[in-house]
A protein has these predicted regions:
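Compositionally biased, intrinsically disordered or flexible polar/acidic segments
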Residues: 1-166
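Conserved SGNH/GDSL esterase-like catalytic core that processes O-acyl groups on lipids
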Residues: 133-136, 144-206
């Protein structure tokens, strides 16, 4: 995906404008909040419909027109890039691997989630990226399957869970920040969970 204002688009990329809004038919676009206009310092979300699995995400952050400071999270606020500064005209490319899942285990079985989990980004059919920070700036985004990387599974309670809303946070959603794109972190933790409830809700089966 090409987020620049350049008229020429690199081969293999899709041009993104402020009118590129997510819908299921298109399968990608700005989501959840107003679209980014390329200049605003407001946070924004970009979603892509992809099957379950691990995905290598490569972002080029920065802008030819202004300095930036960008934080990148995925799904339910899993932290991957924290406060990355870029000077005017500077571009920095970073890669990380995101685990994407939904509730489906098989044709006859799915994970049992609590009512409060139903709207969590962790359990929908999209891979959603959040661009935040003092001045989020992005030039390009590439997403590709990463089937061969190992996956670290996290199970736990409210001290580990991916919290959707600030200012709440737990160590599990900060964990990906410390790993390269050669490993995926799949956080299945949820508030109030124990070993017995993980088995009863089929969380272990989904993992």
């Amino acid at each position: 995906f090409d987020f620049t204002s350049d008229k020429k688009v690199k081969e293999g990329f899709i041009k993104v404008t402020s009118e590129t809004l997510f819908n299921d038919e298109q399968g990608y676009g700005y989501d959840l909040q107003p679209a980014w206009d390329g200049k605003s310092n407001q946070p924004f979300f970009f979603s892509v419909n992809v099957p379950d699995g691990n995905y290598k995400v490569t972002v080029t952050l920065g802008s030819k027109d202004s300095a930036g400071n960008t934080t990148v999270r995925a799904e339910s606020r899993r932290l991957f890039i924290e406060n990355l500064p870029t000077k005017k005209g500077e571009m920095i490319t970073e890669s990380f691997t995101v685990n994407k899942r939904n509730m489906k285990i098989s044709e006859r079985e799915k994970v049992k989630i609590k009512a409060r989990e139903k709207n969590k980004l962790n359990w929908d059919d999209k891979l959603t990226l959040e661009f935040n920070g003092d001045a989020p700036r992005i030039t390009s985004l590439a997403i590709e399957r990463a089937d061969k990387v190992p996956t670290i599974f996290l199970c736990g309670n409210s001290t580990v869970v991916d919290y959707d809303n600030e200012p709440w946070a737990a160590w599990g959603q900060m964990f990906p920040r410390w790993f390269t794109d050669q490993v995926a972190i799949a956080n299945y933790a949820e508030s109030g969970e124990s070993a017995n409830t993980f088995i009863g809700k089929h969380q272990i089966g989904r993992a």
